[in-house]
Every structure is written in C-alpha cells, then in structure tokens.
C-alpha cells in the first residue's frame, strides 16, 4: 500500500448483490480504488466479465484523474486473470505506472481491493438496500429466499429483481456515498 493518496491504486471485479429482471443474473462491476483513502477512482459495469469491463474501468479512472488535474499514481495492484492482456503494454512497469504488482492467481484475498469491497458492502450497501445477504448468513446478513428445485440444485428465487440501469445507478450512488 502507498503512503499518500493517489500513490497506489488497487483494482478488482465484483458481482453486484442484486439480480437483473431479464436474466436473473448479477451485473458485473470493476472498481479502481485509491489504496490509501480507499476512494473509488473508477467503476465500470457489464453483463459479462470481460476485457471491455476492464478497459472501461481504466477509462473512467483516467477521466477522473485528468478532470481534476491529478498526477498518475505511481503503483497499481491487479489480478492476473483479467489483466494478463496488458502485461506488456499498459501494465508494463515504467509505461504508465512505475510499479505494477500482479497478485498470485487463485489468491483473491491478497488484493487490498477485496477488503475495500467488503467494507463498502458492510457499511453502505447493506444499509441502503434491502434483501442483501445469504440464506446461511447471521444476524442482519441473513436473507430469506425461496429454493427452486432444478438440475443444478443451486437456484434461489429472490423477492425482487431490477433493471440494468437501476442497478448501475444505485451502485454509483453507493460509490459516491462511500467516497
């Protein structure tokens, strides 16, 4: 982690907690956080976890940095699986960032962004939206849902579903409140 704000950023993907009306799936989000202040510097949203999601997050972050006239952070911490395409371009040390740290594959807890995602969920998202949690959760993190018997045996029916635009707008408001 850096010592000063905007000295290092950390990036991670997350599935939004509520589901879409049309597909009953979750919207994928990608965030860029400042490691020191933990502010969201960039966010992007998609129905699929792919390279466009990553590129749009970088664009959103760089637009914010340029808009305010801030300098480019010295370091970045990223995961392997979605960032390997940029290893010899954008994420080559010295190209944009002085220091690039790739976290170990299959070790998601290593990234600082994972902890920030969890803190934001506990402090903001649970408070702002009803019905968020797991059927096996404890206390306020437990939700009631209806089990659907099917071939996969892992389907649960939620009480309410949302449009893509509603979910993105709600998440952007949550990010604004988090910052």
For the regions a protein language model found, what residue spans apply to each?
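Mobile-element integrase/transposase regions
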Residues: 1-31, 39, 52-57, 63-64, ...
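Short His-Asn-centered micro-motif
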Residues: 11-13, 44, 77-80, 103
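Short, well-ordered alpha-helical packing segments
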Residues: 27-30, 42-43, 55-63, 77, ...
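A short acidic/small-residue loop/turn micro-motif
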Residues: 45-50
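Loop/helix-junction capping segments adjacent to catalytic residues or to phosphate/diphosphate-binding pockets
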Residues: 51-52, 110
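Globin-like tetrapyrrole-binding proteins
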Residues: 70-74, 80-179
